[in-house]
Amino acid sequence: MDITNSPGSPKRLNVAIIGSGISGLSAAWLLSQSHDVTLFEASDRIGGHSNTVEFESGHGPVAVDTGFIVYNEVTYPNLTALFRALDVPTAASNMSFAVSVGNGAYEYSGGTGLGLFAQRSNLVSPRFWSMIRELLRFYRNAPKDLSIMGGISLDDYLARNGYGRAFREDHLYPMAAAIWSTPAMEVGRYPAASFVRFCCNHGLLALRDRPIWRTVTGG
């Protein structure tokens, strides 16, 4: 759609934008500089996935992001530019990951050996070591298989390649559920190629040299 009469003579338009997530708000902010914008939102608040709530703790008020709100400057160049244009303060984010199953019966955290084996029983757990082996195999092979995945689901890809329940239920599905705020039981229905491509683009399948993640200061 051409929104100008000519390069030197813009026509002021009435623009409707549906949805007040990051895409809608960014478009509204940019277009409002030259046009009349009306924003439509079905919810009773704006912000979409971004939603910070505050609660009182024993140490004072704490701001909590109910969504998984982080970005990195490599994968999100336009968002980075928007934050800089608006002077939005950001800070480095701790991107740690931990899993707890069965009310603490089985737990581990990523990042270091201390976290992986914080629960000493993991040292002699066949299920845990199976997860580690298949994690390394998936991280190594899944990107290479992108061209042959076609339209199959993540569940189908994992089944065809012999990945077991430990890897699915104790690592891959909880990680995806945390990132996308979706039930872990639904992750397997995602298209395998889209899932793996997202993970590759965001450095999630790299064991080292991962991107530096940031978040908005104060939520």
Where is each model-derived feature located?
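Extreme N-terminal leader/targeting segments of oxidoreductases
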Residues: 1-15, 34, 55
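N-terminal Rossmann-like FAD-binding beta1-loop-alpha1 element of flavoenzymes
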Residues: 12-39
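Short, solvent-exposed loop/turn segments at secondary-structure junctions
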Residues: 22-23, 44-46, 177-178
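Glycine-rich FAD pyrophosphate-binding loop
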Residues: 32-56
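Conserved beta-strand segments of alpha/beta enzyme cores
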Residues: 36-38, 63, 89
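N-terminal glycine-rich dinucleotide-binding loop that anchors FAD/FMN and/or NAD(P) in oxidoreductases
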Residues: 53-79
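Mobile amphipathic helical/loop "lid" adjacent to a hydrophobic cofactor/ligand pocket
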Residues: 72-207
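Short, intrinsically disordered, charge-balanced linker/junction segments flanking boundaries
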Residues: 209-219
